[in-house]
């Protein structure tokens, strides 16, 4: 038996929502340039294409398949860990310890950039996922898959059409 309904449902993983809401293309995503550290273009509406790659971005790799509802918690934990790692510089007592910290500094800076990017992406996604329209759409989809009576679902679908929901959402 082939399941034709599931591919039509809204994806609820972090990577899936990024794709559905922001539109990924072959792993690339167009984002506001200020999200990736281009401070000189902040507020100008400039965009940059970035590659979301779990092999090069450990934070993305750790949240990409998670339900979007827990991504905020994971980003918060990553921020606390990063802050703790930066504070490790105060624990250096010898030249070797200082050298080890300096050697880790590049990794810490890339982790900071990744955290900033994924925090901005998550904030952008929340603008969509916190809407009444999004919750209504999920409710209709879940009721349809659960086998709820069809008459109220058809009425809900009509309501989505009346609200001007994009065709692909319905």
PLM features per residue range, with description:
Residues 1-170:
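Extended, well-folded catalytic/binding cores that form a central cleft or groove in large enzyme
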């Amino acid at each position: 038996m082939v399941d034709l309904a599931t591919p039509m449902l809204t994806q609820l993983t972090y990577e899936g929502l990024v794709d559905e809401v922001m539109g990924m293309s072959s792993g690339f995503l167009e984002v506001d340039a200020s999200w990736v550290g281009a401070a000189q273009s902040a507020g100008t509406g400039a965009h940059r294409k970035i590659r979301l790659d779990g092999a090069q971005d450990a934070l993305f790799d750790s949240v990409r398949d998670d339900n979007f509802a827990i991504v905020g918690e994971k980003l918060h934990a990553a921020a606390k860990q990063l802050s703790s790692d930066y504070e490790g510089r105060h624990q250096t007592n010898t030249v070797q310890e200082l050298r080890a910290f300096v050697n880790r500094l590049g990794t810490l800076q890339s982790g900071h950039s990744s955290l900033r990017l994924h925090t901005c992406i998550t904030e952008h996604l929340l603008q969509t996922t916190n809407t009444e329209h999004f919750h209504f759409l999920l409710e209709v989809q879940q009721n349809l898959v659960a086998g709820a009576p069809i008459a109220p679902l058809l009425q809900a679908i009509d309501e989505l059409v009346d609200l001007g929901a994009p065709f692909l959402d319905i």
